[in-house]
C-alpha cells in the first residue's frame, strides 16, 4: 500500500529543518565556474576528448555532510586556488536549466567521489551503455595511469575529495544524486506524466535509484525524494503553487536579455486578427465510421447547418445556455492550456495535446493512441457529397508513425516528448516543404470554387479557431485542451476554407456524463467570435487570463427568464438593453484607461496625436471659417486641385463605365420631364432643348472645375416653381421674361461673390431637418397637385361624350399626333387614355422601385431593374400609346435638330436691354430681389446636397467643396440666361444615386453584418460623360416626339409620392391618426410625449399651409423668403416651446446611409427632392 499525503504532512515538511530543500537556482555553480557557450565545431572536438567513468555501487553507506552555503563556497574557492598551474585548467560545464541547447545536446557526465569510496574494479562496475561506448573509443595510457575526467582538472587528495564532494553537493541538488550507476542529470527526465504519482500504481514509489541510497535513506527520506522527483514543485519550497499554463519557454543564458523584457517585447509584437470559427462534432456516419462533421461556423454571427437539408441557415446572434458557460469555465479551469505552441503540423499538435492531457491527469496513458486517432480523423463539411468526381483533399494520416512511440509500457528511461518532435520545432525547412506536408493546398477545382464565395466574406488577415467536441466511449471523464499556436498555420483539410489556424479547442468525454458537449463547443465558439474575448485569447499569459475573459463576457451577457415568448415584440427591449450595457462597458474601459495612463503612454499618446494631426490635414472641417476673405474658396482649391491627376486616373475602372450608363438614364428622364413641364409653364419660351443644352454645358464645366465632381447638376422642382411664378409676374407687369432673367443672373454673380468672400456656406449648418422637411413636403404637394390639375385640364379639353362628330377627327393624323397650329379639342377617348398612361407610368415606376427591395429574383437583377425603373416605365407607356393609333394624345413638343423650342418667339442670344421693347432701368436694379430669392433656392439645394454626399459614413477621402461648388453653379447659372437657358442646381437624388453607383462595397462582410464601404471612385470623368451623353440626346428629337405629356405627368406624380415616403414629417402625420400602442420604436416616439410630438408636427403643417397660400397668390415669388424664415423660427421660437432633449429627438438627422443593396433607397436617405 502506498502512502497518501495530506496537509499535515506538508506542514510538517515545511517546518522540519532536515527536510528543507533549496530552490534549484541556489545549487547552480558560481558565475566564474560556468562554462562559456562554445561553437558547435569546438563542442564536437571536446566531445571526442571526454571520458566518462562509472562508479560502482558502494557497500558502505556514504557520509553526507551538512554544511552552510557560505562554507561550501569558501571551500570551493580554496580548492580552485590549490590547482596545479601546469595542468590545463578546464571550467565546469555550464548548467543552464531549461535551455534548448542543453536539451538538444548531451550534457557532459561529471564523475564524483565520496569519502568512503574505494577504487572501482572492472568486476564490480556496472557501466551504463553510454559509458561502455566511451570506454571502447578511449584507450588507456601506457603508464597505466587513470583517465582524468574533463570536468576535474586534478586528482584530489582525501581531504580535497571531501571538500570537492561538499562543494559539489552545494552545486548539485542532493535529490539528483543517483549513485555510481547514475552519474549524469538529463533535464528531459524532469518531464513526467501525472500517473507516475498515483499512490496505488506508482512505479517509483519508495524505489531508490541505487543500492547506496537504499542503505543510507530512511522511509521519510524516500518519501521526500519521491515528492521532489515526481510531484509538481519546480524549484520552489514546499508550499503549493499553481503552475503556469503557458508552454515551457526555454530559459536564456546569461548573455541574453531577461525574461521580463522578452515577454514585453513579445506582447508588443502580437496583434489580433479577424476571426473565423468552425465547430466540428465527432459523429458516426452511415458507414459506421467516425469522422468530424462541421456543425456551425462564426464570422461574426452564428450560422448552423440544418440537419435535414444539410445546408446553411441564416446568420443569427448565438443564444447560449448559462449552464454551458459555467461548464466551459469549469472545463478551462481544470483542462490543459497550451499557449504559444511552436508546431506546424496537425500530428505534431495532436501529439503534444495528448501528452499534455496525460500529464494533467485528464486521460490515462493507455488512451493515448485512441485519443490521437480521434483527433486525426477526417473532417467533412456540408455539401461534400455533392461534389461528384471532385473530392475534398482529406487528411487520411496513418497512425503507424505514432504507434512505435506510444506503447503502453512505462519506459522511464525515455522522455515523454520524443526527440523527433523536438527536432521538428527547429526544422524550418521541413515546415515549408510542401512535398512532405500532410496537408497540401488543394488544386483549383470544384471544392476551391465552391468555398470562394465564403472566402470572400472573410477578411484577408483572418485567423481561424477550430473547436472539436464529441463523445467517445474509451474515456472515463471529459478531457479538454486549448492550444494557441505561436504562429498561424494552414491546415487545408481541417477547415471548409483555406484560412490559417491559430487556436484549437478540443473537448472529448464519455456519453454517460450530463455534459452537453455541443453546447459547450457553441459557447466557446461564441466567445472566440466576441471581440473582447478574442483579444484576451491573443494576449493571455496563463489560464487565469482566459477565466477573467469569460467572467467579463458573463458580465455583459443577458439572461432571459425561462418563459414562453409569443411574438417578436416581446423581445424588442433586449437589443436596447444590450446597447446600454455595452455603452456602460465602454465607459468603464475608458475610465480605467484614463486612470492607468503612465508617463510612457503619455509620450506615445503625444506622438499619436501628432501623427493624427498629420493624417487629418485633409479632414479639416470645410465649413469652418478662416476669418480672411475667400478663405474657404482658397482652402477648397488647395485641397482638391493637387489631386486632379488622380481624379482622371481613378476613372479607369469598369464600375465607372456601368455608372455612366446608369446615371445617364437617371439624369435624362428628369431632364425630359422637367423640360416638357417647363415648356408648358412658360408657353414655349424654354423647353426640352434649352434644358438639355444647359444640363450638358454646365455639367461638363462643373465636372472639370468642381471641388466635389460627384455632384450631378440638373433642374429641380423648386426652380420649376420659381420659373412659373416669375413668368406669371412678368406677364402681369408687362416685362420681358427672358430679359428679366438676364439681370437676375447679373445680380446672382454679385450675391455669390459676397457670400463666398464672407465664407457664408457655414449657414447651411442652421438649415435643420425642420426646414428641409417643410421644403420637401411643399414641393411634393406641388408635384402631386400639378399632376392632377393637368389631368383635370385634359378632361376639360377632351370631355367624355355619348357621341362624337366627324369634325373631331379632322385635326388628327393616323398616328394620333397633333397638327401644329391650332389647339385640338373634344377628341374621343383622349382623356381616358391620358389617365391610363399617367397612372400606368406611375405604378410601373413605383412597383419597379419596390421590386428592387423585395425578395424576388437575384440581387443584381433587382438592382438593375430598380435603377432603370423610370426609363422602363416611360418605354412601356410609349409602346402602349403607339399600339393605339386611333386615339389622340398630346405629345412632347421638341424641335428638330439644334434649335430653340419656339424659334418664332426668341433666338439663342438674349439682349440685356430688351428684345421687342426696352427693359425698364428701375427693373434692372429691382431684379436684385428675385435674384436673392433664386439664390436662396440654389444655395439650399446645393449645400444640403453637398452635406448629404459628404457624410462620414460614405468615406469620401478627397473632401468636399462647399465654397468652390457654390461659386461655380451660381456663376455658370448666371451666364445661362444670356442664351435663354434655365438655371441649374445640384440635384439631390441624382447626386446621391451617382455616389452610390461609384461606391465599392467590401466583399469581406460577415453574413448578417451591415455592408462596409471599401472605397468610392472619386473622379471627374463619369459626371462629364453623363453630361456629354445628355447633350447628345438632342439628336433624339424624333424619338422624343413620341412621348405623350401624360407619361411625363406620371413621372411627376412618381417624384412627388416617392419623396413623401422618405420624410419624417409624413410618418408623424400618420402617427397622429394611429393608436399609441401601434407606434414604432423611433427616437422621436419614445423620447417625446405624444401630444408634444403632435404639436411639433402641427407647427410644421402650419408653415406649409402659409407657404402654399403665398405660392397661390400674386406674391408667389416670395415663397423662398417665407421658406428661409423657418430657420429663425426653429432657432429662436421653438427653443422656448420645446426642451432641448425633445428637439434633439424631433429635429435630428438620424437617417444614416443604407449601403445594403437589398434595402437601399435614396429617397429614404434624404429630405430633399429629385
From Swiss-Prot:
Topological domains, Cytoplasmic: 1-656, 849-863
GO molecular function: monoatomic anion transmembrane transporter activity; solute:inorganic anion antiporter activity
Catalytic activity: hydrogencarbonate(in) + chloride(out) = hydrogencarbonate(out) + chloride(in)
Pfam families reported for this sequence: Band_3_cyto, HCO3_cotransp
Region (Disordered): 17-96, 112-167, 239-267
Key words of the record: Anion exchange, Antiport, Cell membrane, Ion transport, Membrane, Transmembrane, Transmembrane helix, Transport
Protein origin, superkingdom: Eukaryota
UniProt membrane topology term: Multi-pass membrane protein
Signal sequence, start to end: none
Gene3D superfamilies cross-referenced by the UniProt entry: Helical hairpin bin (1.10.287.570), Mannitol-specific EII, Chain A (3.40.930.10)
Residues that span the membrane, as ranges: 657-677, 702-722, 744-764, 774-794, 828-848, 864-884, 919-939, 966-986, 1020-1063, 1104-1124
Ranges of compositional bias, category Polar residues: 246-259
Tissue: Widely expressed at low levels.
Swiss-Prot/TrEMBL GO biological process terms: bicarbonate transport; cardiac muscle cell action potential; regulation of intracellular pH; transmembrane transport
GO cellular component assignments: plasma membrane
Null mutant phenotype: Morpholino Slc4a3 knockdown in fish embryos results in significantly shortened duration of heart systolic contraction and reduced Q-T intervals, in association with increased ventricular intracellular pH.
Chief site of localization: membrane
Compositional bias of kind Acidic residues: 67-76
Biased composition range(s): Basic residues: 32-53
Region span, Membrane (anion exchange): 657-1170
Cellular localization per UniProt: Cell membrane
Free-text function comment from the UniProt entry: Sodium-independent anion exchanger which mediates the electroneutral exchange of chloride for bicarbonate ions across the cell membrane. May be involved in the regulation of intracellular pH, and the modulation of cardiac action potential.
Protein family: Belongs to the anion exchanger (TC 2.A.31) family.
Protein name: Anion exchange protein 3
